[in-house]
């Protein structure tokens, strides 16, 4: 998979779930069906129980393969009580599995660090080295 795995210093401005074309225009996406409430724009997803399904990976235990990040590919209102960037179960979603995409996190990263998800919790973290312990993915 040719997915961005390191933090870039000169990333263009953008919002979570937006594909970044700051370095090149190559990217690859595929469609899937959300199967839980943890599938949201700009978040990592893992394979669901059935072919063509995905479930959230951010903030929960990772039990299957990480497939990519959910793309913001349609208008989602930011007004009113229905303003959510979370997809409901059964919604169609687009997943980026190659290229650069914006994610939004509380953690601070520096240029060149690697992006990891902790398998037990789904927490996103940044490290200077690729994890070899098997406790993290990506």
In which residue ranges do the predicted regions lie?
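Surface-exposed, low-hydrophobicity beta-strand/loop segments enriched in small/polar/acidic residues
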Residues: 1-138
């Amino acid at each position: 998979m040719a997915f961005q795995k390191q933090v870039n210093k000169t990333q263009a401005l953008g919002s979570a779930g937006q594909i970044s074309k700051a370095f090149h225009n190559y990217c690859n996406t595929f469609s899937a069906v959300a199967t839980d409430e943890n599938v949201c724009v700009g978040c990592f997803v893992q394979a669901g129980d059935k072919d063509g399904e995905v479930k959230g990976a951010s903030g929960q235990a990772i039990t299957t393969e990480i497939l990519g990040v959910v793309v913001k590919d349609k208008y989602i209102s930011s007004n009113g009580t229905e303003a959510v960037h979370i997809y409901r179960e059964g919604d169609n979603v687009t997943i980026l599995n190659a290229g650069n995409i914006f994610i939004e996190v509380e953690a601070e990263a520096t240029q060149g660090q690697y992006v990891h998800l902790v398998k037990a919790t789904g927490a996103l973290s940044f490290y200077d080295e690729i994890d070899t312990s098997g406790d993290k993915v990506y």
